[in-house]
């Protein structure tokens, strides 16, 4: 949670966090709320009114963080998303593009970060090859990382990546 707190604590605008599963979305959102962040979630099991409430609250600034599955990546229009965090690495480059495309819109500044484990390195490299780019990497201590998986399941470390030209905080 230290790493996420560090990333979120420096953001001025809204942050959109993508997870792969509904359960992961719920777990991350609950942990963020417990840590004192104003957070909401969107995933496929939420009713349309729950999704609308979360999205409207995010757009209006009542929530600093929106945690979502890929359901929100396509067609989501929020003007002031300062940071997109891929909490779970997407398996397809196309999904990666749709996720990170939620930040830095209409000429504004934005940052995209991806969190992955060593096991996912091949998937990240496949995305980089497809997109013909190399992302900057930064190591994190697994004991202070995000609550995505327990420490024993993260192998040795976590890594953050950023799109070229973006700076980690």
Where are these regions (language model features)?
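Conserved helicase RecA-like core
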Residues: 1-169
């Amino acid at each position: 949670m230290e790493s996420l707190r560090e990333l979120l604590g420096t953001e001025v605008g809204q942050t959109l966090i993508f997870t792969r599963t509904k359960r992961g979305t719920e777990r991350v959102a609950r942990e963020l709320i417990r840590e004192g962040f104003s957070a909401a979630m969107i995933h496929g099991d939420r009713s349309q009114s729950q999704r609308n409430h979360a999205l409207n609250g995010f757009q209006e600034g009542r929530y600093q963080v929106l945690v979502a599955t890929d359901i929100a990546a396509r067609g989501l229009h929020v003007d002031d998303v300062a940071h997109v965090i891929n909490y779970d690495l997407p398996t397809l480059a196309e999904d990666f593009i749709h996720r990170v495309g939620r930040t830095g819109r209409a000429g504004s500044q934005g940052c995209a970060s991806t969190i992955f484990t060593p096991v996912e390195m091949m998937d990240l490299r496949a995305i980089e090859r497809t997109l013909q780019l190399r992302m900057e990497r930064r190591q994190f201590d697994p004991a202070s990382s995000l609550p995505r998986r327990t420490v024993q399941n993260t192998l040795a470390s976590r890594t953050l990546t950023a799109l070229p030209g973006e700076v980690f905080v």
